[in-house]
Design a protein with these regions (language model features):
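Mid-domain beta-loop-alpha active-site segment that forms a flexible
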Residues: 1-64, 202, 206
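Glycine-enriched catalytic-core subsegment of oxygenase/oxidase enzymes
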Residues: 45-48, 53, 57-60, 64-284
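Conserved small/polar residues in nucleotide/adenosyl-binding loops
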Residues: 16, 282-287
Length: 287
């Protein structure tokens, strides 16, 4: 934003900013759109993928991807794009009873970008389910469709499986039960604690997967599939001398019916250092 707005009396801008870069206050940041600016959030991926991608992460026993690539509408240096697509490739995992776990691709779309309609999807039926999101599992024998947050799952064939209930269910999960399950676990003795459904041992790696998608979008200017070493938390195919530029301002104009393009770019930065910074948390210094 090019202008500075008056800070509302009800807002402590310094406290809100915390360890992030101190920017002049602008009403576009708060209370909702802060998540779209890189100084404060991670765009639609950080906002919704932590909910929608939890189903494949848990069901398919995913951990670290080995490859990732991203593409989007115009990417600016200060904020997330309007629409984006990320592809994450995960290695084969240990097979489960009656279910093989080969290498698998996970695709994320947002901002109006959509996956292809699965073969056999009912004509006239909207692909997007209620809640503004869906997950499609493409299997060798059937296709599973889940609504936003994994709700209302159904098989494309119409078959109703006799699915065993193998996971503990949280009562009233969508109405405060999920949060109280976490509070309950915090209060229990470690010796007898029933782990919450939102345990950090699962939530941490799952959110690393989401953040990897954000990095893929921000590194798309390298024009390559990025290879990831999860154990050592680093990309293995970004060279020491590779550089990256991002658009600061899109100077697109139409004059007398003719378009003109006059983008303002950042200076080139070292791509390897740029990729390492979000992983190392160098922006946050603790005493």
């Amino acid at each position: 934003p090019e202008k500075e707005d008056r800070i509302p009396k009800t807002l402590n801008w310094d406290l809100f900013t915390g360890p992030a870069k101190m920017n002049p206050y602008n009403e576009i940041y708060h209370p909702w759109n802060w998540r779209g600016w890189w100084d404060y959030g991670t765009g639609a991926l950080g906002d919704m993928a932590c909910h929608i991608l939890h189903q494949p992460f848990r069901a398919l026993k995913l951990l670290y991807p080995t490859k990732v690539e991203g593409s989007s509408t115009l990417l600016l240096n200060a904020c997330a794009p309007q629409a984006q697509h990320v592809k994450l490739t995960f290695p084969a995992r240990e097979n489960m009873p009656k279910v093989a776990m080969p290498e698998v691709e996970v695709h994320w779309y947002d901002g109006g970008m959509m996956p292809d309609r699965p073969k056999g999807f009912p004509e006239g039926k909207q692909l997007m389910q209620s809640g503004g999101g869906l997950t499609i599992f493409h299997g060798t024998k059937d296709t599973l469709i889940c609504g936003c947050y994994g709700q209302n799952p159904w098989l494309l064939s119409g078959r109703v499986p006799n699915a065993p209930k193998v996971c503990r269910r949280v009562p009233k999960a969508m109405n405060g039960g999920h949060e109280m399950d976490w509070v309950r676990a915090c209060k229990e003795s470690p010796s007898s604690r029933v782990m919450p459904k939102s345990d950090f041992s699962e939530a941490g790696p799952m959110n690393e997967m989401v953040a990897m998608g954000v990095l893929a979008i921000r590194l798309q200017g390298l024009n390559k599939t990025l290879e990831w070493d999860g154990a050592n938390m680093r990309f293995t195919n970004i060279g020491d001398d590779e550089t990256l530029r991002t658009v600061i301002k899109d100077g697109f104009k139409i004059h007398n019916g003719h378009p003109s393009f006059d983008k303002t770019w950042t200076d080139p930065v070292n791509a390897k250092a740029f990729a390492e910074e979000p992983v190392s948390y160098t922006h946050l210094t603790l005493p």
